Amino acid sequence: LLPVFANLIPADPAMEALIRKMRAPFEDKLGEKLAVTEGLLYRRGNFNGSWDQLIVDALIAEKDAELAFSPGFRWGTSLLPGDTIRMEHLLDQTAITYPWTTVSMMTGEQIKTVLEDVCDNLFNPDPYYQQGGDMVRVGGLQYVCDPNARMGARITDMRLAGKPLDAGKTYKVAGWAPVSEEASKAGGEPVWENPAALARGKGGRLAVAVPGYGLPGRQPRWVAAPPA
């Protein structure tokens, strides 16, 4: 294992003092104990992670939505089973300049289009058309993704609560990190408030079930499924 070099370099006293000064007004909020995690909390997968699952689970619960989208970010602190989840950990997963939550009514066809568009950004065979590295995270929805399929045909077997997603039916979808100015001014609270509320309501213990992946046959096919 490589050493963590930051632990071997003495801190600059002036910078350390500045950091303490800047953090001081927020220490109580940052240090709030939300819950103890029963499992590993991480955010390193291309399709999902347990931090991502916590976020989408919270959006569904707090927004009374049928499914939820979360951006494919991969930063933040990983926590081991038994670690205390503090507000600072939640903020370092979600604190961006456009953290507002959204609720939209989308048809099954529109939901598939969103997933297909992101997939094409990731898996287009022409590298000049590849525009991102991570799939949008999804809560409440089960689907199969075949990266080697043609554009518009990578997402199949979409299911909500075990039933096939209806292309013509409208669903309530929660999300966050809207890029349009109009959406950011719609009045949605910062996303971290939702997982914080969910964690506080779990009586001090928090367990997050992370969907698994399948790799049948020779063609890579990932399965993203809701927790049992």
Predicted regions mapped to residue ranges:
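Hard-cation-handling environments
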Residues: 2-85
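Charged, low-complexity surface segments at secondary-structure and domain boundaries
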Residues: 1-12, 38-44, 96-103, 191-200
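Feature captures C-terminal
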Residues: 49, 53-228
